[in-house]
Amino acid sequence: MLGSFFDEGNAPLIYGLAKKGARLLAEQGDDIAGHLDWTTKNARAKVPFLAHTMTIADAILKLQFALKAHSGTAFLDHHELRPFFPEATQKRADPFRLSVTFPHDGRQLAIGVVPDRLMSFVYPDNTRHNFALEIDMGTADVWSNNLRTKSSIRKKLLGYFHAFTQRRHQEVWGFHGFRVLTLTVSESRIQNMLKAQKQVTGGLAPSMFLYSTSERIAEHGILGPAWTGANGDGISLLPSLPTSQPLEFDHVHP
């Protein structure tokens, strides 16, 4: 067992995959990398990493269960998207990474963004919504002037925004469009992110970034009007649900 990091309530127990378990999964046909040192990987799994990973898993499970109530809507989660990526991307070791270069302080700055999860909702008419999910645990700076060596929300916003303006998402993922969903820890942090977004984008692409918290999702459901953005509050992820502003469809699923 790797850990249990909640103080109250029914705490989930987290177990690591050891060599024997990996061997069994491989024998059952799962794609398990045999060269990995699972003991070392488990030892490196500290509490912040576990908390972040569990929060991602919780969000994906909420989405999966919520979408079951909407028959005809398919959910493609992360690696399920890979077969639909351009051929060159499918061959890459890091197919989910968007790399961009843009001017900053008189020099060209190269950065990359990798979503915590990439996913698509595919509707009965084969239109779809594409989302990059980011989980913010409240530990990273929202705004940092150090873009070269330090992680920050600003750096992620810059990466996604310039990837969008340079159409990197279309080149790498084959997406005609996408939105970034950020789950964070408080309303005040959302407001700080919205301020950072406005400074980064200059007010362009206001509907590209949406934000929510666990409290909002508990009240409205993860698909419902729990999301807020630069254009306003009360935004739903599904077109069939009440929303303050419908999300435009991204493109037709291949």
Question: Locations of the language-model features?
Answer:
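Active-site metal-binding core of divalent-cation-utilizing nuclease and nuclease-like domains
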Residues: 4, 71-132, 152-155
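Core beta-strand-centered patch of the WYL/Sm-like small regulatory domain
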Residues: 50, 57, 61, 65, ...
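Nuclease-adjacent, charged terminal/linker segments that flank catalytic cores
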Residues: 1-47, 51-53, 251-254
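Internal, hydrophobic cores of structured domains that mediate oligomerization or house catalytic pockets
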Residues: 27-34, 44-89, 114-118
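Short, flexible loop/turn elements at secondary-structure junctions
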Residues: 19-21, 82, 119-123, 137-139, ...
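Surface-exposed cleft-lining segments at the edges of enzyme active sites
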Residues: 42-48, 85-87, 98-108, 139-148
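Non-catalytic C-terminal interaction segments of nucleic acid-processing enzymes
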Residues: 141-254
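Short catalytic/ligand-binding loop motif for oxyanion handling, primarily in non-cytosolic enzymes
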Residues: 24-25, 84-89, 141-143, 189-191
